[in-house]
A protein has these predicted regions:
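Accessory alpha-helical DNA-binding modules that contact the DNA backbone or grooves
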Residues: 1-131, 138-165, 169-173, 183-185, ...
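Short acidic-aromatic active-site loops that bind/stabilize oxyanions
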Residues: 94, 266-267
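Two-metal-ion RNase H-like nuclease active-site motif
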Residues: 117-119, 259-263, 333
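Charged catalytic cores and adjacent phosphate/nucleic-acid-binding surfaces used
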Residues: 126-208, 213-265, 271-285, 296-326, ...
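Active-site catalytic microenvironments in core metabolic enzymes, especially phosphate/sugar-handling
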Residues: 331-334, 461
Length: 498
C-alpha cells in the first residue's frame, strides 16, 4: 500500500509526518560521515541534542562518550567530522578564525609584502563570529588575481571593481578590498560598522586620508579633535559622543584575570583531576580556582549527589592545606529546575563558597516561563552567579527568550553576579547587553566554563567581547586577587538571609 501511495501521489504521508516532527538539526546530522540513523536517534532522544552545534559542544564537554555505543575514539571522530562539515558552511566562530588567521596573514604578506596588507572587518572588530576574513590590499584586481594561481588555487566567488572574494581550501571566505589609490580609505571604512562609519562621516564629513600612514588611522581621530576609538568599539554612533567628552575607559585585558571561576573536573564531566587543574592554574599565574562541577540533576554529566559533594569538599580542604599562595574554592554549577528552584537543599547549598545557577534542561520556553524560572533562581539567596544567561550556542542554538533588562534588574536587586561565559560557542551574556548591567552596577564575571586545563585559555574570548562592552577590570569578578575574592565570598555568605 505504501508503494502504491508513492506511485500515485509521489510521496508517503507517514514519512512526511515523521520528517515534520523531526528537528531540522537532527535531519542535518545525517550529513555527518560515520553517524548512522541509530546513533543519531540516541543523540536526539536520549541526550536531547537537536543540532550539529549542540552535538559538538557536548563532545567537547566529554558527554558523548558516556552513552552506550560511544567511546573516546568515536567522540573524537565526531568532533573532527563536525569541524570539517562546519568549515564548509558559511559563518565561523571567532576562535575558529583565530586558529588559522596567522597562516592567512603570513600567506598574504608573502604575496603582497607586510606594508601592503592590513587586517580589517568583523574579525578585527572582535565580533563573536565571522563570515569572511577581510583584508585591505594595496594592489589592483588585475595584479592580485595572478598571484592566487597555484597548484590548488582558492576559488574566486565574486569580483567587483573594488574587491575580490575567495573561498580558501579550509572553507573560510577571504575578502580582499583592493585598489592602489584608496588603501587608507578602504581600511577606515571597513574597520567599523555601517552605523559607526555613517555617523562619523555625518558629523565630521569625509576624512582626508593619508597614504603616509596607511595602516594606522589614529590621525583621523586626532584631526577632528576626539579621542581615539579602537576598531573593537566602532559599533554604534554613541561611542563617538563618549570619545568627544573624554578618554575612553581602560578596558579589561587578559592579564587582568586573576582566578579561574567555573570549571569542571573529572568528578563530573571534566577531563582532568581537581589537583591537576589547581596545579595548572597556579603554574599559569592564577591565584585561585573555583571548581564548579555539575549538580545532581545533570545526570548526563555525572552530576554530584550529596555524598560526592562531601567527599569533594574533603579533598579540597586537603589540597588547600598543601597549597601556598593559591586556593581552591568550593562551588557547584547548580541546575535551575523548571520551577526555578535549585536542585539541592539550603543546607547543602550553604556548604559552597560560590553557587553558579544555570539552565541546562527544557530549553524550549516562552519568554514568560524563562523569566519566571530565571528570576526565581536569582532570588534564591544562595545564588552567587547567574550562569550563561540565555543558554545560546553561537551558530547552533538560539537562546531562550528573555527580557535582559529585567534579568539584570533582578540581579542588581539580589546582589547576583552575571557570568560572561567565555566559551567561544557561548559568549553569553551577549556583549550588547552588558552596558545596561554596568549602568546598574552589576558585576560581570568572565568565566571559561572549562572542562579541561586546555579550556582555561577560553578566558581570552570572554575578555575580547567584554572589551566591546567597555568592561574594566574593576567591573569583573574574576579580576579580583585572592584576598579580594576571599573577602567577596565572605561578604556574600554573610549577606544571606532566609
Amino acid at each position: 500500500s505504501k508503494i502504491i501511495e508513492i506511485l500515485e501521489t509521489g510521496e508517503l504521508k507517514a514519512l512526511k509526518e515523521l520528517i515534520e516532527k523531526t528537528p531540522v538539526g537532527v535531519i542535518e546530522m545525517l550529513n555527518l560521515k560515520g553517524l548512522g540513523p541509530k546513533k543519531i536517534s540516541t543523540i536526539w532522544k536520549e541526550m536531547g541534542i537537536e543540532s550539529i552545534g549542540e552535538l559538538l559542544y557536548a563532545c567537547r564537554e566529554n558527554r558523548l562518550k558516556l552513552y552506550k555505543g560511544f567511546g573516546e575514539k568515536t567522540q573524537q571522530n565526531v568532533i573532527e567530522t563536525i569541524e570539517f562539515y562546519l568549515n564548509n558552511q558559511g559563518s565561523h566562530l571567532y576562535a575558529q578564525v583565530e586558529a588559522v588567521e596567522p597562516q592567512i596573514t603570513a600567506y598574504l604578506q608573502k604575496l603582497f609584502s607586510p606594508q601592503n596588507i592590513a587586517l580589517t572587518g568583523n574579525y578585527k572588530r572582535q565580533l563573536e563570529y565571522v563570515d569572511e576574513h577581510e583584508n585591505v590590499v594595496n594592489s589592483s584586481n588585475e595584479m592580485i588575481k595572478p598571484k592566487f594561481l597555484s597548484a590548488q588555487p582558492p576559488e574566486l566567488l565574486e569580483e567587483t571593481p573594488g574587491s575580490l572574494l575567495y573561498k580558501l581550501l579550509n572553507g573560510l571566505k577571504l575578502r580582499l578590498y583592493t585598489g592602489t589609490a584608496n588603501f587608507s580609505k578602504n581600511l577606515f571604512e571597513t574597520s567599523g560598522s555601517k552605523e559607526f562609519i555613517d555617523a562619523f562621516t555625518a558629523i565630521y564629513g569625509k576624512p582626508e586620508f593619508s597614504d603616509a600612514e596607511i595602516t594606522d588611522d589614529k590621525y583621523l581621530f586626532s584631526s577632528v579633535g576626539i579621542n581615539y576609538i579602537p576598531p573593537f568599539l566602532r559599533e554604534t554612533a554613541k561611542i563617538i559622543d563618549k570619545a568627544k567628552v573624554g578618554n575612553l575607559p581602560n578596558v579589561i585585558q587578559p592579564t587582568d584575570i586573576k582566578g579561574i571561576i567555573h570549571c569542571h573536573s573529572n568528578w563530573s564531566d571534566g577531563s582532568n583531576t581537581l589537583e591537576d587543574m589547581a596545579n595548572a592554574a597556579k603554574e599559569q599565574g592564577f591565584e585561585y580556582l573555583v571548581i564548579s562541577d555539575h549538580s545532581k540533576s545533570a545526570f548526563y554529566a555525572q552530576g554530584l549527589f550529596e555524598e560526592k559533594i562531601s567527599a569533594q569538599h574533603k579533598l579540597i580542604d586537603e589540597l588547600n592545606n598543601n597549597l601556598t599562595g593559591f586556593k581552591i574554592f568550593k562551588s557547584i554549577e547548580s541546575d535551575i529546575l523548571y520551577d526555578g528552584s535549585l536542585d539541592y537543599s539550603n543546607a547543602v547549598l550553604a556548604t559552597f563558597d560560590i553557587v553558579i545557577a544555570s539552565v541546562h534542561s527544557i530549553l524550549k520556553m516562552t519568554e514568560e516561563k524563562a523569566m519566571q524560572r530565571l528570576i526565581a533562581a536569582i532570588e534564591n539567596p544562595y545564588t552567587t552567579i547567574l550562569g550563561h544567561m540565555t543558554g545560546r550556542l553561537l551558530l547552533s542554538r538560539k537562546g531562550y527568550p528573555v527580557n535582559h533588562k529585567k534579568i539584570i534588574d533582578a540581579c542588581a536587586a539580589n546582589n547576583v553576579v552575571i557570568e560572561l561565559n567565555a566559551h567561544p560557542s557561548r559568549l553569553d551574556i551577549d556583549w550588547r547587553q552588558i552596558e545596561y548591567a554596568l549602568e546598574k552596577n552589576v558585576l560581570i564575571s568572565i568565566n571559561p566554563d572549562a572542562h579541561s586545563i586546555e579550556g582555561f585559555k577560553d578566558i581570552r574570548y570572554g575578555v575580547l567581547v567584554a572589551q566591546k562592552a567597555m568592561v574594566t577590570k574593576e567591573q569583573n569578578l574574576s579580576s579580583m586577587n585572592l584576598q579580594q575574592f576571599e573577602e567577596f565570598v565572605q561578604r556574600r555568605k554573610n549577606s544571606i538571609r532566609l
